């Protein structure tokens, strides 16, 4: 007879301590935290939050320890398929995570994968992007952490902490690590996506050595250790204690903002934003950045309140897709491309680690963005005034950054997609500024990409370029900065075609076909008017720890520097996303104003033809073009 035990007695929606001797201390909320309302969907907390354990055993849960009045229950469970943990943690549909023990198994498997000294009596951080299921998940994580001997957890108020903020808090508070509840730029809501990942003590995502162990332990897990404590009130800043275990609810903005103020010259940026001839707009996409936009851009930098759009974090992101690109941030694009549009526009994604930068009727590609930031950082950003240790990009990102590194004589690294590869270089003191073509940009101030950091970096550059511009004189614009950069370094025309939620079988067969093609390819082969320099499946050897990562993307590199790259993305929750990257370098300034899709058309046609993408996926056109 299958055993099913529901932990209804201590997973409840209200904060009701079981023991009269449990101390409770609630402090006043920090004034730095913005007033915002997280949208609530109708649900029964008891149903959604209950952890149910299924086992062939008919035994009841056993109390395995009761230190300082905390009862720890050992609940039988069994492995659940499909918990393979990737570069961005575990992402699935909400309904999958709501299956009995699905989340609890993964959290317990994580603790089973860590050395005890990495969490026993230690400090962990917990936060997320405010999406649907975060509130229930937070209570589950807190109780399992307590059950496994964690000493204290810091939780963002209302469970809110952006991914960059989690990294910042881990580093400032010297925590052992932290949980991030997010599916990043993927949609949220009962029918959409949820995700969880773990960051280590440096603030960077857990390495593959740990994520592989987590997956292995999900295949053999037999029990969940969970503390019999009530739900913790996450709506007020303060400390709640249960014996030797405590939960501190913190202002999600203050530590992160304090760090940013050491990186940038806020007075310089404020002098730009407060100019009557400069108009700024930021689209938070109803995601976590909305919790940071008002304290940073309005309260600190004097932007007008109406310059922040979609600034209230919602559990379903306002029925939107919180991915800052030309397709999903179309409202911002429309504003920026309108007649007499703002001078500067930006957007961030679900968990606040990605960004999109726009000028008046001008889109800055992420590849160009990181290159421009790197080229101007020493002059415009105080954090880099003494030195820039090195530059790095993900392999699919255009070579624009390479040219900056070469001109400035800086160390340069090309890594696989995944921020953890940058983190290793940063921890070794080899890297300062890095970026990915997937709208991720950042530096070694933390160990995650950082959307608001990128916005502030761009504002710093524009402010620096205009510090001597008098009222009435034409401001140096975003497009001016980029075009000047192209004139100095040349332009890397770049585009990415995304084919989302393809049938996995067809997508995998396409990659297999391309790998077979690699084995037959040789330098000098002609592909239309392009001559092959080399073709490979990208392999990376980490210069810090010597680890090797293979099969990171099929590359065709031609003698003129043009590239075609094919990858399957691991950040979605369903199906496969096929990504095709096309790049061509153009040194001729007279050709820099050509539309990228026109300049790249011959190479795009070649990319689709060589891969037989339509035959394998059935797709006539991409979901998103960047």
Swiss-Prot record:
Keywords: Carbohydrate metabolism, Chloroplast, Glucose metabolism, Isomerase, Magnesium, Metal-binding, Phosphoprotein, Plastid, Transit peptide
Gene Ontology biological process terms from the UniProt entry: glucose metabolic process
Molecular function terms from GO: magnesium ion binding; phosphoglucomutase activity
Transit peptide: 1-66
Gene3D superfamilies documented for this protein: Alpha-D-Glucose-1,6-Bisphosphate, subunit A, domain 3 (3.40.120.10), Alpha-D-phosphohexomutase, C-terminal domain (3.30.310.50)
Note on cofactor: Binds 1 Mg(2+) ion per subunit.
Cofactor(s) needed by this chain: Mg(2+)
A single Gene Ontology CC term: chloroplast
Binding site residues for Mg(2+): 184, 349, 351, 353
Regulation of activity: Inhibited by the Calvin cycle intermediates fructose-1,6-bisphosphate and ribulose-1,5-bisphosphate.
Phosphoserine: residues carrying this PTM: 184
Active site: 184
Enzyme class: isomerase
Keyword Disulfide bond appears in the UniProt entry: no
CDD domains: PGM1
Alphabetical list of InterPro entries matching this protein: A-D-PHexomutase_a/b/a-I, A-D-PHexomutase_a/b/a-I/II/III, A-D-PHexomutase_a/b/a-II, A-D-PHexomutase_a/b/a-III, A-D-PHexomutase_C_sf, A-D-PHexomutase_CS, Alpha-D-phosphohexomutase_SF, PGM
Principal location: plastid
EC number from the UniProt entry: 5.4.2.2
Binding site for alpha-D-glucose 1,6-bisphosphate: 91, 184, 353-354, 417, 436, 438, 449
Catalytic activity: alpha-D-glucose 1-phosphate = alpha-D-glucose 6-phosphate; O-phospho-L-seryl-[protein] + alpha-D-glucose 1-phosphate = alpha-D-glucose 1,6-bisphosphate + L-seryl-[protein]; alpha-D-glucose 1,6-bisphosphate + L-seryl-[protein] = O-phospho-L-seryl-[protein] + alpha-D-glucose 6-phosphate
Location(s) in or outside the cell: Plastid, Chloroplast
Function field: Catalyzes the reversible isomerization of alpha-D-glucose 1-phosphate to alpha-D-glucose 6-phosphate. The mechanism proceeds via the intermediate compound alpha-D-glucose 1,6-bisphosphate. This enzyme participates in both the breakdown and synthesis of glucose.
Family to which the UniProt record says this protein belongs: Belongs to the phosphohexose mutase family.
Listed name of the protein: Phosphoglucomutase, chloroplastic
């Amino acid at each position: 007879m299958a055993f099913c035990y529901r932990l209804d007695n201590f997973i409840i929606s209200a904060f009701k301590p079981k023991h009269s001797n449990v101390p409770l201390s609630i402090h006043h909320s920090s004034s730095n935290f913005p007033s915002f309302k997280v949208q609530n969907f109708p649900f029964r907390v008891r149903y959604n939050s209950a952890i149910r354990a299924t086992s062939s055993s008919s035994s009841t849960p056993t109390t395995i320890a009761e230190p300082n009045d905390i009862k720890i229950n050992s609940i039988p469970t069994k492995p659940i398929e499909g918990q393979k943990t990737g570069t961005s943690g575990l992402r699935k549909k909400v309904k999958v995570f709501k299956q009995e023990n699905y989340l609890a198994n993964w959290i317990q498997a994580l603790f089973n994968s860590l050395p005890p000294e990495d969490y026993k009596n230690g400090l962990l951080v917990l936060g997320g992007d405010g999406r649907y299921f975060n509130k229930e998940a937070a209570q589950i994580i807190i109780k399992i952490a307590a059950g496994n001997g964690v000493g204290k957890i810091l939780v963002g108020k209302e469970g809110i902490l952006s991914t960059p903020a989690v990294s910042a808090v881990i580093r400032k508070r010297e925590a052992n690590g932290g949980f991030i509840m997010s599916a990043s730029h993927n949609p949220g809501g009962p029918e959409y996506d949820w995700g969880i990942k773990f960051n280590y003590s440096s603030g960077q995502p857990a390495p593959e050595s740990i994520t592989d162990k987590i997956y292995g332990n999900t295949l053999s897990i037999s029990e969940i250790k969970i503390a019999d404590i009530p739900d913790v009130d996450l709506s007020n800043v303060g400390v709640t204690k249960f014996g030797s275990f405590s939960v501190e609810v913190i202002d999600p903005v203050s530590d992160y903002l304090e760090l940013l103020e050491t990186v940038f010259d806020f007075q310089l940026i404020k002098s730009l934003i407060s100019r009557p001839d400069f108009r700024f707009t930021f689209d938070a996409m109803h995601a976590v950045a909305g919790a940071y936009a008002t304290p940073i851009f309005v309260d600190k930098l004097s932007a007008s309140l109406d310059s922040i759009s979609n600034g209230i974090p919602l559990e379903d992101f306002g029925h939107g897709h919180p991915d800052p690109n030309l397709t999903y941030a179309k409202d911002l694009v429309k504003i920026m491309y309108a007649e007499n549009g703002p001078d500067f526009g930006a957007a961030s994604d679900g968990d606040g680690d990605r960004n999109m930068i726009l000028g008046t009727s001008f889109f800055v590609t992420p590849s160009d963005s990181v290159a421009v930031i790197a080229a101007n950082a020493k002059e415009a950003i105080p954090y880099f005034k003494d030195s820039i240790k090195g530059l790095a990009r993900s392999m699919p990102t255009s070579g624009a950054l390479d040219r900056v590194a070469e001109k400035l004589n800086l160390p340069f690294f090309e890594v696989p997609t995944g921020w953890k590869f940058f983190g290793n270089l940063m921890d070794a003191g080899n890297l300062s500024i890095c970026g990915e073509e997937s709208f991720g940009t950042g530096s070694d101030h933390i160990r995650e990409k950082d959307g608001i950091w990128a916005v502030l970096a761009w504002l710093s550059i524009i402010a620096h370029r205009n510090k001597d511009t008098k009222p009435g004189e034409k401001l140096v614009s975003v497009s001016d900065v980029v075009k000047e950069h192209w004139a100095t370094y040349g332009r890397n025309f770049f585009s990415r075609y995304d084919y989302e939620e393809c049938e996995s079988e067809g997508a995998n067969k396409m990659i297999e076909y391309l790998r077979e093609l690699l084995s037959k390819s040789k330098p000098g082969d002609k592909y239309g008017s392009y001559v092959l320099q080399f073709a490979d499946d990208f392999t990376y050897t980490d210069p810090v720890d010597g680890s090797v990562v293979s099969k990171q993307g099929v590359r065709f590199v031609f003698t003129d520097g043009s590239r075609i790259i094919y990858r399957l993305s691991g950040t979605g929750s369903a199906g496969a996303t096929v990504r095709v990257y096309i790049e061509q370098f153009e040194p001729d300034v007279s050709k820099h104003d050509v539309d990228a899709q026109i300049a790249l058309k011959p190479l795009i046609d070649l990319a689709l033809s060589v891969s037989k993408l339509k035959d394998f996926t059935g797709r006539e056109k991409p979901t998103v073009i960047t």
